[in-house]
Amino acid sequence: MSPAAPVTESSAAEVHREQTDAPREPQRPLKQSLSKSLCRESHWKCLLLSLLMYCCVIAMTWCQVTKVTRLSFDSTFKVKSMIYHDSPCSNGYIYIPVAFLVMLYVVYLVECWQCYSRNELQFKVDLESVTERVQRMQQATPCIWWKAISYHYIRRTRQVTRYRNGDAYTSTQVYHERVNTHVAEAEFDYGNCGVKDIPKHLAGSDGFPVTKLRFTKCFSFANVESENSYLTQRARFFTENEGLDDYMEAREGMHLKNVEFKEYMVAFADPNRLPWYASTCSFWLAAAFTLSWPLRVLTEYRTAYLHYHVEKLFGFDYVSVTPLDHERPFCRHIPRVNTIDSTELEWHIRSNQQLVPSYSEAVLMNLTQQSSCNTFSARGIGAAGGNGFGGYRQNCERCHRSISSSSIFSRSALSICNSSNPRLAFSSSRFSLGRLYGSRRSCLWQSRSSSLNDPGCPTESTRCLANEESPPSPPAYQDALYFPVLIIHRNEGCIAHDHHSLHRNGSCVETSL
């Protein structure tokens, strides 16, 4: 897979021109109730500080209002005593709630400043800008990207100075440092899938003075084929990069090209004339009188919320079939994902043993059984002529092919069963061609070398392990390349072909013979 699969211009243009004529479902901002506003933004820090300050004020008021009876004795006159009424905080206890009130008020102002700064950092726009931005996101070309970072850890040491009991001493510290060795990036190539925008129509924003919007990017698939194409490319990319180092960090996401995406946004109906509860003067005036929390609750209650999903649909015009003829049935692709759960097939693919020998290898092979080789018949492979397999391939061009894990020239292929039951036999080489096409007349292609100047002895001849006497000419090399091919169909495979199901360990593999 290439480091980055470029998106063709035609697929990018489809985002602009492939829009449905049917009106989209409108999506309007929602004004929440008071309870939901408190659950969304409770401002519990401001509420807690306000309650503590109110408690200090109540304590100070109680000290000023409440009177208690005191009894005092005169030290000079041991007999006389004095009874009077005084405040319970007259002996300096009043300074305790005052100190707490001052401390809490300072923390309260700091929290108000933090809330004000957070509000100022929000992206504020008007309604026209919101509509324009939504249109740009709808028309933007999506890009689903993957990133793989291969890395390992190395052991390093450093000298650290420590202090104990006033004495400095140096020690060696061992730590591990991450080292990135390879970074690879790729994109989802959806040229054969097509993409269009399917979000709802934004409406009703002008009915609220303040609207908080949240934008989320997402994508979906219109059919299973497009999803399998995505999963196949994704699995192939991470599989190619997972063994480059000890560890691999995988990242993935989607972004919209040529669009500055903002997740959170605040829209005002009239930015020049803000409502009184949204102005800066009202905020700090309420904060000075410790009424910031009620003002925030009122602001949240009068604010509408909208969660808008920018969704891209892949595969709405996916061409799952390619008819070779209007009168011929056609087949579907079987994706890589559908066979990745098969442990044995996955092992054959990973082992990279599914190779067809070249023409030179076939010519130079040792003929150990020349005397037992006889006529090749096209009926041995279920074809009705010399070019039967090529004709079959033309009828089912788009069928998924999994090449045999054991070559027809391998040693395992020499042990072809001459069984009378034309079933597919499985053993250590269960995907070999000889077993796939094993029948009463099992055929093995072999090559014997001869002189190029000898007209009576061809340079390449093939025999069959049958009892016929006249050996016909072998098929063309291009047709012979297709012999060790195992054709696996999905349930909705070729309609006109005869399928033979093979069951083993609860799995079913359909082959066209």
Swiss-Prot record:
InterPro entries: Tmem151 (IPR026767). The keyword Glycoprotein applies. The chain crosses the membrane at residues 46-66, 93-113, 274-294. Residues 14-28 have a biased composition (Basic and acidic residues). Glycans are attached at N366, N418, N505. Its main location: membrane. Pfam families: TMEM151 (PF14857). PANTHER family: TRANSMEMBRANE PROTEIN 151 HOMOLOG, TRANSMEMBRANE PROTEIN 151B. This is Transmembrane protein 151B.
